[in-house]
């Protein structure tokens, strides 16, 4: 009987994983630009859905962390590692007409990066202006309190984060010119906004083996190599690992959707199955480094803890009698926001899974696209009781480990106790 139960349990897990894979394929078929996950442009909610707050409660304070918006590649190496191989193949007349077209697309991407590597694009600016606009429309009362007109914004020293902060605050100023802003950036703020120092050493050999196995199993390079290269034997001098070479080219080109040029659309050079395979590998890669998983033993939690400590400290000050603070805004990186989301065990991330399961449990294009964000909206009644609602990428969410008091609303005292237990 016990064995029968175990078999049924394993079967249920297998069916669930299959369903998730099929769902992922469906989402990618709808929009293949989702396939490079963290390069994907922010998808704002088509319609803002708000569960009404309990009677008598009004919003009065917002605590926020946002990833920078769409950007250029943060390092030229992300273009050059694939393009340099393409250039070598071209120099030795080894590229087919299709291969030459791929190379031309990468050169278009590279040319667009001149002088702006790592900077925010216009699309990234628009994303943060849009999020700020919807934040204001969603909670106008927060920003219209006569005794709470101060908005404090902080950013890491990285230019794209500073640009994101400026665009966000610019939009809030348009919404309400009477708001008073302070905007600060620097290494001092990166100490808690995006600090990976002090992480314990974790052997990555198992993770690397999983990733190698995943790309080997999922991606068949034969069609692409035959389509791009005239003489594969001669090309071996330059292409040492066909799968990784293909991934480098795909990664370099996928940033096109974020740029201020017409996207050359690298996806046209790949079949859907190839795109899916590259997505699965990329998804697992970032799950391995940005989320709590079995292989890294939740090592990234420390990054999230530093942000959470700041959230708690600033919330305590904002909740004090006489505070003039309407909002605390933070601007940083995916490598910090993702560990925070993982640390909190937000719905869908309650458990740590193996990196091998990443494509079944974590979709990077949904969880951590450009301009992804977490918002905590604080409400209180005339008695001074405080409730909090969480918005993840502007959509209501919950933390299953903590019981809500009604709908998505938490008693702040209980949520604060839970947050404190995570530090």
What residue ranges belong to the model's regions?
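Bacterial Sec-dependent N-terminal signal peptides
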Residues: 1-22
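Signature for phosphate-centric chemistry
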Residues: 20-152, 156-328, 332-423
């Amino acid at each position: 009987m016990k064995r029968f139960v175990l078999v049924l349990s394993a079967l249920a897990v297998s069916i669930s994983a299959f369903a998730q894979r099929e769902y992922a394929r469906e989402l990618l078929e709808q929009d293949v630009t989702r396939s490079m996950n963290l390069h994907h442009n922010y998808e704002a909610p088509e319609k803002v859905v708000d569960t009404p707050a309990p009677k008598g409660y009004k919003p009065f304070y917002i605590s926020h962390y946002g990833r920078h918006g769409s950007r250029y590649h943060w390092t030229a190496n992300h273009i050059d590692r694939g393009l340099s191989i393409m250039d070598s193949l071209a120099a030795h007349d080894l590229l087919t007409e299709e291969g030459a077209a791929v190379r031309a697309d990468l050169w278009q991407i590279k040319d667009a990066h001149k002088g702006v590597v790592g900077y925010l694009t216009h699309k990234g600016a628009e994303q943060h202006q849009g999020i700020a606009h919807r934040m204001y429309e969603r909670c106008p009362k927060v920003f219209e309190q006569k005794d709470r007109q101060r908005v404090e914004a902080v950013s890491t020293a990285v230019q794209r984060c500073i640009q994101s902060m400026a665009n966000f605050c610019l939009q809030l100023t348009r919404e309400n010119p009477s708001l008073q802003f302070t905007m600060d950036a620097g290494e001092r703020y990166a100490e808690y906004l995006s600090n990976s120092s002090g992480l314990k050493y974790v052997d990555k050999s198992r993770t690397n083996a999983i990733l190698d196995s995943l790309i080997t199993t999922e991606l068949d390079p034969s069609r692409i190599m035959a389509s791009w290269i005239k003489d594969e034997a001669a090309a071996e001098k330059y292409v040492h690992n066909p799968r990784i070479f293909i991934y480098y080219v795909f990664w370099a080109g996928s940033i096109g959707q974020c740029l201020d040029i017409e996207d050359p659309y690298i996806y046209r050079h790949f079949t859907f199955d190839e795109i899916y395979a590259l997505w699965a590998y990329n998804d697992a890669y970032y799950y391995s480094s940005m989320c709590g998983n079995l292989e890294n033993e939740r090592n990234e939690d420390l990054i999230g803890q530093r942000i959470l400590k700041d959230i708690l400290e600033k919330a305590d000050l904002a909740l004090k009698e006489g505070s003039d603070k309407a909002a605390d805004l933070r601007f940083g990186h995916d490598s910090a926001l993702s560990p925070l989301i993982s640390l909190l065990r937000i719905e869908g991330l309650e458990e740590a899974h193996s990196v091998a399961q990443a494509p079944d449990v974590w979709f990077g294009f949904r969880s951590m696209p450009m301009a992804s964000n977490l918002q905590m909206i604080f409400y209180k009644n005339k008695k001074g009781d405080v409730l909090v609602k969480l918005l993840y990428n502007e959509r209501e969410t919950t933390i299953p480990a903590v019981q809500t008091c009604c709908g998505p609303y938490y008693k702040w005292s209980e949520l604060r106790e839970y947050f404190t237990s995570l530090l």
